[in-house]
UniProtKB/Swiss-Prot annotation:
Protein name, per record: DNA/RNA-binding protein Alba 2
Keyword Glycoprotein: no
SUPFAM superfamilies assigned: AlbA-like
Extent of the signal sequence: none
Location, primary (coarse class): cytoplasm
GO cellular component, one term: chromosome
Species name: Sulfurisphaera tokodaii (strain DSM 16993 / JCM 10545 / NBRC 100140 / 7) (Sulfolobus tokodaii)
One annotated GO biological process: chromosome condensation
Compartments in which it is found: Cytoplasm; Chromosome
Family: Belongs to the histone-like Alba family.
UniProt keyword annotation of DNA-binding present: yes
Function field: Binds double-stranded DNA tightly but without sequence specificity. Involved in DNA compaction.
Pfam family, one: Alba
Keywords: Chromosome, Cytoplasm, DNA condensation, DNA-binding
Length: 90
């Protein structure tokens, strides 16, 4: 099981993309310099969509520091994930 970090947002299918975009902007305003988005399984597309909307809204205010894709074993099944690390630019 993955431990959630304080600057990590786990993307699920229940919230809207706009809500996650607002969550990231609020975290940047609270003083976090880096925020990590993690989409698992069917939520991978939503994590990418959150990044695209953030890039459209903030432009050069954020940079993509790192993006990882892979799979992890959960209950003897492989589940794909994407991890997108964003950094705030001053």
């Amino acid at each position: 099981m993955t431990v959630k970090k304080p600057n990590e947002i786990l993307i699920s299918r229940t919230k809207r993309v706009e809500d996650y975009v607002l969550d990231v902007i609020v975290m940047f305003n609270q003083g976090y310099d880096e925020v990590e988005l993690k989409g698992v399984g069917n939520s991978i597309y939503k994590a990418v969509e959150v990044y695209n909307q953030l890039k459209d809204r903030l432009g050069d205010g954020i940079i993509l520091e790192k993006a990882d894709i892979g799979s992890e074993v959960k209950d003897r099944r492989r589940i794909s994930y994407i991890s997108i690390k964003l950094k705030r630019v001053y």
